[in-house]
From Swiss-Prot:
It comes from the Bacteria. Pathway: Amino-acid biosynthesis; L-proline biosynthesis; L-glutamate 5-semialdehyde from L-glutamate: step 1/2. It is found in: Cytoplasm. It comes from Nitrosospira multiformis (strain ATCC 25196 / NCIMB 11849 / C 71). The gene is proB. GO terms for biological process: L-proline biosynthetic process. Its main location: cytoplasm. Residues 280-358 form the PUA domain. GO terms for cellular component: cytosol. This is Glutamate 5-kinase.
Amino acid sequence: MESVLKQSRRIVVKVGSSLVTNQGQGLDHSALAHWAGQIVKLKKTGKEVVLVSSGAIAEGMQRLKWKKRPHAVHELQAAAAVGQMGLVQAYETCFRKHELHSAQILLTHEDLSDRKRYLNARSTLATLLDLNVIPIINENDTVATDEIRFGDNDTLAALVTNLIEADVLVILTDQRGLFTADPRKDTQAKLVEQAKAGDADIERMAGGAGSEIGRGGMLTKVLAAKRAARSGAHTVIASGREADVLIRLARGEAIGTQLLAETMTLAARKQWLADHLQIRGNVTLDEGAVEALAVGGKSLLPVGVTDVRGNFERGEVVGCLDPHGREIARGLVNYNAAETRRILRRASDEIESLLGYIGEPELIHRDNLVLL
């Protein structure tokens, strides 16, 4: 088995907190220099590299002399603001020694949810790569409240992979890869060397929380691979403790777990719909509507909706659930939540009499709908 990095041209590399800090107590500058050196060698082989690096909050904790990761959002934001300065300065110093420029890019869900800002971010990243600059990306934790509570850089790295249409996402962690069970608890656990991204069995294998310093467990990495696969990108989950891991992967050596993108690649706009917009509510469908969407490729009509949850406005994203509560699709809704409740289970020709107007005959048009 050969590593998917060997034939790849554009790569997103995500480095976890444990690989860039001194056990969470500030940045490990020798480790950052090591990652920079490997990235430089990849670039010399003709590969383009975007780096998603954790470590800002851990560095902020060190500078503020905090021994434990705080739980209060405003304290996390303060740590991120202080630590981001040190993180970017350290990387800049490392890359300058190789006569390369680096660029800081801080993103939030809001940046990627707005179509215009999404396209601007993509253009900026493409320009930086053309200029031989190494983009260093992190979440803008200082302003993104819900990202600090629920987000992680694994997810961000996957969304960046979609954004720039990278060939491979490499997630480096302190574990060797994905195992059939938790190797810390089960001595019979075996490394999964290769599997299909999005495989339900693989998602069941993954579990457990991350460290006190970082936020991402193995499940977030497996779900990140599923997201990356929507733009046709493969994912490698490997140990950053392996010597020269990036260089060896680029040479074709199989290290860690490869999760292959074997699903149909979504068009760029539908990738944006699937992963870059936050869901504001859910609608539950009957079996007929599920079949119409999943098999027939139809639009979602109000008659096929049995329940509405959430408080959403026209044009926002809602998840489409089957009768068992499993999300099968999501899309941009043509009516707000209150209106949707009034027209559910009703034929489209009744909408005007129920609401006093008709915007669209569909609740979600198929052009604004993506199957998951």
